[in-house]
Amino acid sequence: MDFNLTDIQQDFLKLAHDFGEKKLAPTVTERDHKGIYDKELIDELLSLGITGAYFEEKYGGSGDDGGDVLSYILAVEELAKYDAGVAITLSATVSLCANPIWQFGTEAQKEKFLVPLVEGTKLGAFGLTEPNAGTDASGQQTIATKNDDGTYTLNGSKIFITNGGAADIYIVFAMTDKSKGNHGITAFILEDGTPGFTYGKKEDKMGIHTSQTMELVFQDVKVPAENMLGEEGKGFKIAMMTLDGGRIGVAAQALGIAEAALADAVEYSKQRVQFGKPLCKFQSISFKLADMKMQIEAARNLVYKAACKKQEGKPFTVDAAIAKRVASDVAMRVTTEAVQIFGGYGYSEEYPVARHMRDAKITQIYEGTNEVQLMVTGGALLR
């Protein structure tokens, strides 16, 4: 793994940095407190071409033969330093919607759905989770019934969907044969505005307030056969392989959150004076900061390694699970310690470390809980 960033990777990193500093930082506190999903801001981000880093030029991207996964991961990490909600909005579009279409879609599907996602003219989402089917995807109740004309009729709902109600294109999973369990799940591509496809509850979340999360509702939604993604009954495999990539995006988000919290804690420790000297002059605080830095750097290596293995076309399932587990745990520990360094001020929404701590928690949950990452890693060891 080469630790030297290419010129292209540095360009994408700078794009994300400049956007974060100029566009996200000035308004993130207000948008977080008011729970504002800023569509104009997201549209501006998508127009920068960061979504294209992941894909080849053939589909509107910037890569020669499959794009550059690390460039995209660097951008997600950098954006998360400024606004974790915006970072996951990008990650869900690229990792969870565009990527499975690129990996499993037909050329016609790629032309119709992938290209606008890559070019940044449309936003994407991924609908797998249901009220009674979180980790256990085989327990989902959404049904896709095949009609005589070859179309499918979807009925059911999905919850906790990132970009729900904001996205233009959705990857949705439904049971086409309940008797087959996981082998009876099929993936479909749905478009916003399809008759019968509506939105339910908007989630009031602990963190990532600038990301929109909503319920998807399907009532007799007619889906053409050409919108089936992959083969019938292969949806579970598609979902799991998609989540592998999504975990690297979440790990990058967690890394960015942790870095922001550390930067805030370092700065505060230099300014806050107690007992006649800055907090950073107390060994207990300087050691705490050092430990936070060490954890972040260890997590960074795992995240970048997973991204590089995916880029190289090597098996990366376990690497993604490890990176996601470690980076999200580090984010939670680092943000908690940052709040501790701030003391009472850290518990106040007046300072950003409270937001960082709230944002960090979800990284231990979505794209598979951290307990699932242990199952994935342990299963690979014992196989």
Swiss-Prot record:
The active site is at residue 367. It comes from the Bacteria. InterPro entries: Acyl-CoA_DH_CS, Acyl-CoA_Oxase/DH_mid-dom, Acyl-CoA_Oxase/DH_mid-dom_sf, AcylCo_DH-like_C, AcylCo_DH/oxidase_C, AcylCoA_DH/ox_N, AcylCoA_DH/ox_N_sf, AcylCoA_DH/oxidase_NM_dom_sf. Its EC number is 1.3.8.1. One of its GO terms (molecular function) is short-chain fatty acyl-CoA dehydrogenase activity. The keyword Oxidoreductase applies. Changing residue 367 to Q: Loss of activity. This is Acyl-CoA dehydrogenase, short-chain specific.
